[in-house]
Amino acid sequence: LPTAEAALASVYRDEILTEADLPKKFFSYTPCFRREAGSYRADERGMVRGHQFNKVEMFQYTLPEKSDEAFEELVTKAENLVKGLGFHFRTVKLAAGDCSASMARTYDIEISIPSMNGYKEVSSVSNARDYQARRGNMRVRRADRSIQFMHTLNGSGLATSRVLPALVEQNQLKD
């Protein structure tokens, strides 16, 4: 399982929810396994680029007109996790070419890892708009009885394998 997103994106497959049912918010904690392509760089070995790791996934189904607001909410949740740990971080809006084909918008939250000479992603938040809903036939019945596709969003919790080195490095004392 590379991420819980695939399973969470199918919860309402072939269903029609009402406006009152939305938003639906899910959190999932799963072990993840990935074969990381292009992960052979010397600065991304060890804990920072593991093939097996645990991850919390945030997932949300929402009304199309609430999609941007829900996206900002997920970004804020991820940023608050990083702020709570006192990290130096930045939030980066990915260019369209760097987003997966299914995502309309993605922000990466990156923390400073001085020994790696820069920032590394610890969370990613994306808005698929109606892409996943169309593929899964997940719709919402509006108050006027019309039916349209809902929007889906997801975000990863902190990548613990990258948080640990940053915790050590950003909290070192001279003694």
Segment roles from a protein language model:
Residues 1-175:
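TRNA-recognition modules of translation machinery and tRNA-sensing kinases, especially anticodon-binding
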